[in-house]
Amino acid sequence: MKVLSSLKSAKNRHPDCQIVKRRGRLYVICKSNPRFKAVQR
């Protein structure tokens, strides 16, 4: 999982990527290709 300052590019990496907010942090999750996961602190 990458730690990024901006998730816009991470969201556009794959069509299945989606942004989720959990516990005050923003995450990018990708079910079909999990290597595209990212988090913004």
UniProtKB/Swiss-Prot annotation:
MF term (GO), any: structural constituent of ribosome
Keyword Isomerase: no
PROSITE patterns: RIBOSOMAL_L36 (PS00828)
Domain of life of the source: Bacteria
Keywords, comma-separated and alphabetical: Ribonucleoprotein, Ribosomal protein
Family, as annotated: Belongs to the bacterial ribosomal protein bL36 family.
Cross-referenced PANTHER family: 50S RIBOSOMAL PROTEIN L36 2 (PTHR47781), LARGE RIBOSOMAL SUBUNIT PROTEIN BL36B (PTHR47781:SF1)
Alphabetized NCBIfam families for the sequence: PRK00831.1, rpmJ_bact
Name of the protein in question: Large ribosomal subunit protein bL36B
Taxonomic source organism: Vibrio cholerae serotype O1 (strain ATCC 39315 / El Tor Inaba N16961)
Top-level taxonomy: Bacteria, Pseudomonadati, Pseudomonadota, Gammaproteobacteria, Vibrionales
Designated gene of the protein: rpmJ2
